[in-house]
Design a protein with these regions (language model features):
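Active-site-adjacent structural elements that line small-molecule/cofactor binding pockets in enzymes
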Residues: 1-292
Length: 292
């Protein structure tokens, strides 16, 4: 039996307190299950933003999507996680990744390191967080017995780490290029990544939830025309190839609903995250899927 859908929205733009809370309430009204905050310079600090979101809402879970592990000391992060889980009444979901924007580390005066070094640091962070948050001696204590852990992954070592530790396996649907740019994965490439993850996770007692970050959502009767402004950003792919990317949902409402169902069947993606600019346009998709 397929896992039920969950839907998250990543709120990226800063706003005064009243506007931020109103935006969070709107996400709840639209049916989103998770309100998420990123971890990039120039965007709101994730933990206070999530506490404010909790004060403004009742139902949604609240998560980081995803923390840049290179910004965080594990002991200090454990304190933030436990405090935020307490202040949100146990609604926190912790998302972690290696980070992919070198310029942010340079601006913050933090070491960047090689890809392997960043994965090593993330592994140490995950293991130390688990040790601290599972200890009865750690103060403060989180409300949840285990704060659900999401790890954003694509490379082999990251998928192994995700298989070993994460409650939610988040697929970006893209590979990182030098300089911090992202190159989308075709469906066949994503098949291979998901298959490797499943192989690595074969011994798990409980299967993880699989997440996909959807980058583009456009409801339209003319997908070819609608996708034109995006093509210069993905010059190595044809129009049809872009429209077939798993992270792109462009078409009529019926088309998108069926595409979401088909991708759950094919890849196992039951938890979809959209970006803030797509919050309103994706809401009818949520409503239609909930009707079924």
């Amino acid at each position: 039996m397929a896992r039920p859908f969950r839907f998250g929205v990543n709120l990226m733009s800063a706003a005064p307190a009243d506007e931020w809370r109103a935006k969070c309430r709107r996400a709840e009204e639209l049916g989103y299950d998770v309100i998420l905050a990123p971890d990039h310079l120039g965007m709101p600090a994730p933990f206070p933003a999530l506490v404010a979101a909790a004060e403004a809402t009742e139902r949604p879970r609240l998560g980081t999507f995803v923390l840049n592990a290179g910004f965080w000391n594990p002991a200090l992060l454990a304190r933030e996680v436990a405090t935020t889980d307490a202040l949100t009444d146990g609604r926190l979901e912790l998302g972690l990744g290696t980070g992919y924007v070198q310029a942010e580390h340079e601006t913050a005066g933090l070491p960047w390191g090689s890809p392997g070094e960043r994965v090593d640091h993330l592994r140490r962070t995950v293991e130390e967080l688990e040790r601290l948050l599972e200890s009865e001696d750690h103060q403060p204590q989180p409300v949840q017995q285990r704060v659900p852990l999401l790890i954003g992954a694509n490379g082999d070592r990251m998928l192994r780490l995700t298989a070993e530790h994460a409650d939610i396996a988040a697929f970006t649907g893209a590979r990182t290029r030098d300089g911090g740019s992202l190159e989308p994965l075709a469906a066949e490439e994503l098949d291979e990544r998901v298959a490797l993850y499943r192989k690595l996770a074969a011994g798990r007692a409980e299967p993880a939830e699989l997440n996909l970050l959807v980058q583009i959502v456009i409801v339209t009767d003319d997908p070819g025309a609608a996708i034109q402004p995006w093509l210069p950003r993905i010059p190595h792919l044809t129009e049809q190839q872009v429209l077939e990317l798993p992270i792109v949902l462009v078409g009529t409402l019926d088309d998108i609903v069926e595409r979401v169902r088909a991708q759950r069947d094919r890849f196992g993606f039951s938890y979809l995250t959209v970006l803030e600019p797509n919050m309103e346009v994706f809401a009818p998709v949520i409503a239609r899927l909930r009707e079924a």
